[in-house]
Amino acid sequence: MELSSLNRIYNLVMRKREKENHEVIFGPNGQGHVYKPAPYHGCKAKKLKDKTRWIDDANFEFSIFNLADVHTGLPYPENIKVIDKRWMNDDGKGLYAIFNQGKNLLGQTGERLAFFPIPPNAQDPWHGYPTNSQYIGDELVEHWYSINVISKGIYRKLLKHIL
């Protein structure tokens, strides 16, 4: 998926609000979810040992979230055996995203994936951060490969957890 495609998705689903305290909140998106960027993961955040930072602004961050979250739940027209499902990790603890078959960096320290943990309360906003492939599940990797989100080379790297 090219950046122009990502921007089209972003323009379709983006609703950005700014609260009185200048917090930015996006959504609800097509799944009805609200997204609130975590300032310590922002592209301009101070470098912290245990926090990854996005390579681009909050709009980009929300677009990446929507790649993982907004899906129809219906079979793909070109392959009715495969369902267009959210990119939930095998353990059910959150969503993963990858952009442009993993060719583009998402994080400032080389991360090519993003993780969006499920909020503790259903009404809470989502947030996410760039990450590596240490905890990604094989079923999700298989799904991405089956719908051509990733190439065979990236598929192999993800299964070995070296991306």
Give a label for each model feature:
Residues 3-141, 145-159:
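Functional cores of ribonucleases/endoribonucleases
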